[in-house]
Amino acid sequence: FLPLFASLIGKLL
């Protein structure tokens, strides 16, 4: 799991 991907999910949430 990439941290950048997690950042995108955080913005969606």
Swiss-Prot record:
Signal peptide: none annotated. Coiled coil: none annotated. GO terms for biological process: defense response to bacterium. Expressed by the skin glands. The keyword rRNA-binding does not apply. It is found in: Secreted. The modification Leucine amide is found at L13. Keywords: Amidation, Amphibian defense peptide, Antibiotic, Antimicrobial, Secreted. One of its GO terms (cellular component) is extracellular region. It comes from the Eukaryota. Belongs to the frog skin active peptide (FSAP) family. Temporin subfamily. Antibacterial activity against Gram-positive bacterium S.aureus (MIC=140 uM). This is Temporin-1Cb. The lineage of its organism: Eukaryota, Metazoa, Chordata, Craniata, Vertebrata.
